[in-house]
Structure formats: C-alpha cells, structure tokens
C-alpha cells in the first residue's frame, strides 16, 4: 500500500510538472518561428553593437537610445562596460549615432546600466530625459536635462523608492512624475526565477511623484513596456509573458481604470506611440525561449507590430516587420518618424528602415 501511495504521488507530481512545463513553454511562445516580412530599404545603424533596448523620438526628429543593458538572464555582448545614451538626428540623410556625455558630480557613469527611457518637455521647452538605471543590479530612475548645444545630459537627480524595486520601463508625465512598470515582485534573483517559472503574475505598475508614490495596477505576468496616448487620457501597458497589451483610462488623480486588453501571438515588449496618429508601434519577441536561453546558432527573432484604432471595438493589427535573427536579434522597440522606422534590440544592433 505504501508503495502504491508513493507511486500515485509521484505520478501526480510528474503530471503537474508536465502541465506546468507546457504552460511555461506556452508563455514563452517556445515553438513559434517567424515568416519574414521585409521592408523595402533597411540599414543597420552604425555604432550600435550592444543593444538599443529603448528609444524615444522627439517631434523634431532627435532620437534618444539606451544602449548596453545588462539584465539578469539575458545575453550581453559587452558585459564589462557601462551603458550609454545615444543621440540620432533622423533629419539627416544618413543619420549616425552620437554618445551623449553625462555631466553632474554625483552621478556614477561607471555603473550606468540604462533600461527604459522617457522624455518630458516643459512649457519653457526644457527637455528632461528619465532613465531606468540598474547600478549593481538595483533599480533607480535618473533624471537628466538635455543640453542640445553641448550634446550632453546634465544629471539632476537619482530617484529611489521601495515601490520601484524592479523597474523595466517608464513613461514621464512631468519632470519628476512618471508611471513605471516593475517586471518582478521579488528582489532576490532566486525567488525571481521561481516567480517567472511559476507564472505568479505579481508584477505591478506604480505612479511616482515627489509627493506621492502608489501602486496603480497589478497582477501582471512580467509588466514591461508602458506609454501614454497623445491626449494623455489613456495608458498602455505591455504584459510580456501573457502576450497582452492593456488599455487603462487615466484619471485626474493619476489612478488607472482598466478598459480593455488585446491578445497577441508574440511577447510584447516596449510600446511607442505616434504623436500624430496615436498608433502604437510595438517591438516584440516572437519566441521568448530564444531570448532567455540564448543560442548563437539559433538566435532570437525580431518582430514589429503596428496597432491602429486601439480604442475602437475593432483595432487593426499589422505585422510590419519580421526577421528570424540573421539580421536583427531580439527586437524590443520600434518608433516612426516621417515615413521611417527605427527598430531597437535588447542586446544586439538597431535597424533603420523606410516604410
């Protein structure tokens, strides 16, 4: 009888493990391969070799790019060098990147590890760049002021808070005000790995201001990219491992109310919003297994989606670009400017295409 009970328990355990393993593979979209979708004229951006994880394009065509991210469990081609912020002028016929110098006596450039970024321009046309930073595996938000003539960033402030432990991306709604996604609940790397494997969906979104910090949305399976509609009324949140983009209504007191969700057959990463049309442009990972378990012989693919009329009952989703990783590995972000598309990656290169 004891052997029968032990065998039964073992069988139940194996069945649960197999079911959970299958769920884990589904969340990572582990079996998907992409069919190429090409654009007419694409060129790799010179000077970007170690990632372009997030980018934002100003209305005047200046693009800010975060490069050199070191993230636990993700490949890095230059793990011992600090990250940087790059500038690209998309008004140029053949734009190149320039590394922005960082000034400010209290900022440690040697530990700079930039992740998500967002800009805010005030009434005096002063432009602020907010950057998620992971110095020594921690999470901070660095506040910079862009000095256009000097082509540099003046460091103004480092923001830390207990509700910002695992920041991934932010969207600025003021010089020191933002919504931010925490992609994990736990701080400990071991517990984070189990959190992800078990699909606990405990990650969350925070509203931060100097006077108030609070959780405004929760229950995400790896909250990732975040952005806001051009009119400031709606917030978009990418849930990476659930393959969803959520639409929230933003209220005057900065709280969020869920409106709808869209499902995709891909892992949605960063969200860019076209300021003229309101369209969403999303950098995606068709197969998350290839991102988290990197193999140079079978690299992660890239994919870009465009979402039109997201607030209507029938949004239009278009696969604008897809490639199996031979050109561009691990796309995370895409943004448009005057008929051109700039695509960034978590640890690889960047691609500039005509639409």
From Swiss-Prot:
Glycosylated. The signal sequence is not cleaved. SUPFAM superfamilies: Calcium-dependent phosphotriesterase (SSF63829). It is an enzyme of class 3 (hydrolase). Plasma, associated with HDL (at protein level). Expressed in liver, but not in heart, brain, placenta, lung, skeletal muscle, kidney or pancreas. Keywords: Calcium, Disulfide bond, Glycoprotein, HDL, Hydrolase, Metal-binding, Secreted, Signal. Pfam families: Arylesterase (PF01731). The active site is at 115 (proton acceptor). It is found in: Secreted, Extracellular space. Disulfide bonds join 42-353. One of its GO terms (biological process) is positive regulation of cholesterol efflux. Changing residue 134 to Q: Substantially reduced activity. One of its GO terms (cellular component) is blood microparticle. Changing residue 192 to R: In allozyme B; increased arylesterase activity. GO terms for molecular function: acyl-L-homoserine-lactone lactonohydrolase activity; aryldialkylphosphatase activity; arylesterase activity; calcium ion binding; phospholipid binding; protein homodimerization activity. InterPro entries: 6-blade_b-propeller_TolB-like, Arylesterase, Paraoxonase1, Serum_paraoxonase/arylesterase. It is linked to Microvascular complications of diabetes 5: Pathological conditions that develop in numerous tissues and organs as a consequence of diabetes mellitus. They include diabetic retinopathy, diabetic nephropathy leading to end-stage renal disease, and diabetic neuropathy. Diabetic retinopathy remains the major cause of new-onset blindness among diabetic adults. It is characterized by vascular permeability and increased tissue ischemia and angiogenesis. The preferential association of PON1 with HDL is mediated in part by its signal peptide, by binding phospholipids directly, rather than binding apo AI. The retained signal peptide may allow transfer of the protein between phospholipid surfaces. This is Serum paraoxonase/arylesterase 1.
């Amino acid at each position: 009888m004891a052997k029968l009970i032990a065998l039964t328990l073992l069988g139940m355990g194996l069945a649960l493990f197999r079911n959970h393993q299958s769920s884990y593979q589904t969340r990572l979209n582990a079996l998907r391969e992409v069919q190429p979708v090409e654009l007419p004229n694409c060129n790799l951006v010179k000077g970007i070799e170690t990632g372009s994880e997030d980018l934002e394009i100003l209305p005047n065509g200046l693009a800010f790019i975060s490069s050199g991210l070191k993230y636990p469990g993700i490949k890095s081609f230059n793990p011992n060098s600090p990250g940087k912020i790059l500038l690209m002028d998309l008004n140029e016929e053949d734009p190149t990147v320039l590394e922005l110098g960082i000034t400010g006596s209290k900022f440690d450039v040697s530990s700079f590890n930039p992740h998500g970024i967002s800009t805010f321009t005030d009434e005096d046309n002063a432009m602020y760049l907010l950057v998620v930073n992971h110095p020594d595996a921690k999470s901070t938000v660095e506040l910079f002021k862009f000095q256009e003539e000097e082509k540099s960033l003046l460091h103004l402030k480092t923001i830390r808070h207990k509700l910002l432990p695992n920041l991934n991306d932010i969207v600025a709604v003021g010089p020191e005000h933002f919504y931010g996604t925490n992609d994990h609940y736990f701080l400990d790397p071991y517990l984070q790995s189990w959190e992800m494997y078990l699909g606990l969906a405990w990650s969350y979104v925070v509203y931060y201001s100097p006077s108030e910090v609070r959780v405004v949305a929760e229950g995400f399976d790896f909250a990732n990219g975040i952005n806001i509609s051009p009119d400031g009324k709606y917030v978009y949140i990418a849930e990476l491992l659930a393959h969803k983009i959520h639409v929230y209504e933003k209220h005057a007191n900065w709280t969020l109310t869920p409106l709808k969700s869209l499902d995709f057959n891909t892992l949605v990463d960063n969200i860019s919003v076209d300021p003229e049309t309101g369209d969403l442009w999303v950098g995606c990972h068709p197969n998350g297994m290839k991102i988290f378990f990197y193999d140079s012989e079978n690299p992660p693919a890239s994919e870009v989606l465009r979402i039109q009329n997201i607030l209507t009952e029938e949004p239009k989703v278009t696969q604008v670009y897809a490639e199996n990783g031979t050109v561009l590995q691990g796309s995370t972000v895409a943004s448009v400017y005057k008929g051109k598309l700039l695509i960034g990656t978590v640890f690889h290169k960047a691609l500039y295409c005509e639409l």
